[in-house]
Amino acid sequence: MDEAAIEDLFAAFGPVRCKRMFGGIGIYADGLMFGLFAFDQISLKADAEFASLLEGEGSRPFQYEARGRSIKLGYWTLPDSAVDDPDAAADFARQALRIARAAAASKPRKKQKTPKN
């Protein structure tokens, strides 16, 4: 799947921006990454409640192997039923963006460095 196909899939959601990163593609809306495309699958940011819903739809947690360890990032695969259904993909994307916004709001703001005289 290329960037144009990702944008088409989420067209009912609204404009998304794709950014290549780490051999995959980050999927952004409103300046926040809410999804990613890697290893031939789309995954969405999820909290525990959304992960439970996604698991019920047959999704799996996004994970990869690095240095002999399995790494999980808090993303879950887009359900197969939504891969060819832009309206369903949009519904899932809205939930993932809500979670990305909440995560961004809960991060402590960085203090600006004051110049030393």
Model-assigned labels for residue ranges:
Residues 1-117:
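Charge-dense, helix-prone N-terminal extensions
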